UniProtKB/Swiss-Prot annotation:
Pfam families: SAICAR_synt (PF01259). GO terms for biological process: 'de novo' IMP biosynthetic process; cobalamin biosynthetic process. It comes from the Bacteria. PROSITE patterns: SAICAR_SYNTHETASE_1 (PS01057), SAICAR_SYNTHETASE_2 (PS01058). This is Phosphoribosylaminoimidazole-succinocarboxamide synthase. The keyword Signal does not apply. GO terms for molecular function: ATP binding; phosphoribosylaminoimidazolesuccinocarboxamide synthase activity. Pathway: Purine metabolism; IMP biosynthesis via de novo pathway; 5-amino-1-(5-phospho-D-ribosyl)imidazole-4-carboxamide from 5-amino-1-(5-phospho-D-ribosyl)imidazole-4-carboxylate: step 1/2.
Length: 235
C-alpha cells in the first residue's frame, strides 16, 4: 500500500493510501504537554496508544457509534476513513480536574451532578481557547443542529466509556474528542481515544493517564501498559 505523508502532528503522522477516502495514522513515541511546550521521546508509547485506541474504537463501532476507525494495520498503524476535521476539541467532564479546577478555583475529584461538555477552538497560535456555542457559530465552525449533535454524541459516548472503565476499576474523570465530516458530509468520531486524551484514576486516586507525564508522577509507559492490560479484561 503506497503512502505519502500529508500531516505530521504531535502524536501521529497521517499518510495517504491508494484509496482517496482512506488514510493511515501512524502513532509516534512522542509525549507532549502544555500544547507542545513540554516534549519527550518515550519508547513504546506509540504502540500502546495504537493498541488502546484501536480497542476502544472497535468497541465504539460495535456499539453503533459512527467513527473513522477501519482496522489496526500494525503495532503503530491503523487504517482510518478520511475526514475533514472540525476545528473543535469537545471535552466532557465527569469530575473536576485540570484546567476546570484551575479556572473555577475548585478541588480536583469532585463528581459533577451532570457531566459538563465544553468546546475548545483548535488553533495552536491561540493556544486552543475555551469557547461557547455562540463563538462556534460566529467562527462558522458548526451550526445549531451540528452543535447539538456534537454534545449529544459526546454524552452518548461517555455513557459507554464510563461503564467499560468502571468494569476494570478505573474512573473516567474527563476526556477530549474530535469529530470530522466523512465523504458523505456525516459527522463521525475521529482522532483517537487513549490515556493521552482522557483522565483515568484508579480506586486509590492514582493517575493512569498523561498527567503522569505532565506532572512528573512516574513512567508514562508503565501506566499506559497497566491500562492496556486492564482493558483486555473486557474481551
Amino acid at each position: 500500500m503506497s503512502k505519502q505523508l500529508i500531516y505530521s502532528g504531535k502524536a501521529k503522522d497521517i499518510y495517504t493510501t491508494e484509496d482517496e477516502n482512506l488514510i493511515i495514522s501512524t502513532y509516534k513515541d512522542q509525549a507532549t504537554a502544555f500544547n507542545g511546550v513540554k516534549k519527550e521521546q518515550v519508547a513504546g508509547k506509540g504502540v500502546l496508544n495504537n493498541q488502546i485506541s484501536s480497542f476502544i474504537f472497535e468497541k465504539l463501532n460495535a456499539a453503533g457509534v459512527a467513527t473513522h476507525f477501519v482496522e489496526k494495520l500494525s503495532d503503530t498503524e491503523q487504517l482510518n476513513k478520511k475526514v475533514k476535521i472540525i476545528p473543535l476539541e469537545v471535552v466532557l467532564r465527569n469530575y473536576t480536574a485540570g484546567s476546570f479546577s484551575k479556572r473555577f478555583g475548585v478541588d480536583e475529584g469532585i463528581a459533577l451532578e451532570t457531566p459538563i461538555v465544553e468546546f475548545y477552538y483548535k488553533n495552536d497560535d491561540l493556544d486552543d481557547p475555551f469557547i461557547n456555542d455562540e463563538h462556534v457559530k460566529f467562527l462558522q465552525i458548526a451550526d445549531d443542529q451540528q452543535i447539538a449533535y456534537l454534545k449529544e454524541e459526546t454524552r452518548r459516548i461517555n455513557e459507554l466509556l464510563k461503564v467499560w472503565f468502571a468494569e476494570i476499576g478505573l474512573k473516567l474523570i474527563d476526556f477530549k474528542l474530535e469529530f470530522g465530516f466523512d465523504k458523505d458530509g456525516k459527522i463521525i468520531l475521529a482522532d483517537e481515544f487513549s490515556p493521552d486524551n482522557c483522565r483515568l484514576w484508579d480506586a486509590d486516586g492514582n493517575h493512569m493517564d498523561k498527567d503522569v507525564f505532565r506532572r512528573g508522577l512516574g513512567e508514562l509507559t508503565d501506566v499506559y501498559e497497566i491500562v492496556w492490560e486492564k482493558l483486555q479484561e473486557l474481551k
